[in-house]
């Protein structure tokens, strides 16, 4: 079994990560990714997402409300409907109330118009547990701290 895992890493995972690096994704070592996620129960690179939300949504998202936006993203259920909701966040279709304008405004999570404004990370051996079940992805891609 050890050969199979070693072979999979050598023939699939490593080449995929290497290619991602070649096209501009920054590699994050597994141990560093675990710290950025705040442990195996974390789904996001919290600090990265926090910084990008504030940067991409000037005046709408601030240090005062960024945690609430992240809580909303983290609260999305792991279902087909939840996947659609996360896609809505990625596409900028989810909104929050803008007190200064007295209206809902869409939140930008990914800047599609200017890709250089985004942060692209790739990591491997992403193990996640919710306390009852554990799941592991060989390779994980994140844009602005959010797994895609």
State what each model feature region is.
Residues 1-148:
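An alpha-helical interface "stripe"
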